[in-house]
């Protein structure tokens, strides 16, 4: 059986964010009550299209074969329940991956998927972390403005120890 639109959508989104953030990018796509990851296996046995193999080792997930093909290659799948997302994000980030999360929303009789969050090792603060956190808060303000017909960049910065 040849591919359905969900797999094409997955690989198109993966390609977009991999081009933007690099090869260590993984898409977590909500399908029903699961976040799913897909990959493809060609006739030579090579897995491509995403980092599904590496991610499954990191997250201790099983890879299963779908009975559909995309461009003639076998579709592979892994996933976890939606309520477990916060448990897997730190594992993905610890393996130096960027996690792009697309959620599913009802739209008429069907569903649409839209970007919910992009987690990267430098931007994620784990709420379960036991690492001490300071009481500092920082605000950065950046604005482009014209001064006498010339573009200027104005930057404001404040740090407060609360």
Residue ranges with predicted function:
Residues 1-162:
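Basic, polar low-complexity surface loops/patches
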């Amino acid at each position: 059986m040849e591919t359905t639109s969900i797999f094409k959508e997955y690989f198109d989104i993966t390609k977009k964010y991999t081009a933007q953030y690099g090869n260590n990018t993984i898409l977590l796509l909500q399908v029903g009550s699961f976040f799913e990851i897909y990959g493809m296996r060609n006739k030579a046995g090579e897995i491509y299209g995403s980092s599904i193999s590496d991610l499954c080792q990191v997250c201790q997930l099983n890879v299963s074969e779908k009975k559909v093909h995309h461009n003639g290659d076998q579709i592979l799948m892994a996933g976890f329940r939606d309520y477990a997302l916060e448990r897997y994000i730190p594992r993905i980030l610890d393996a130096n991956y960027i996690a792009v999360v697309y959620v599913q929303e009802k739209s008429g009789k069907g569903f649409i998927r839209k970007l919910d969050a992009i987690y990267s090792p430098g931007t994620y603060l784990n709420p379960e972390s036991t690492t001490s956190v300071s009481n500092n808060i920082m605000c950065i303000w950046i604005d482009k403005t014209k001064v006498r017909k010339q573009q200027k960049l104005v930057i404001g910065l404040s740090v407060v120890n609360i």
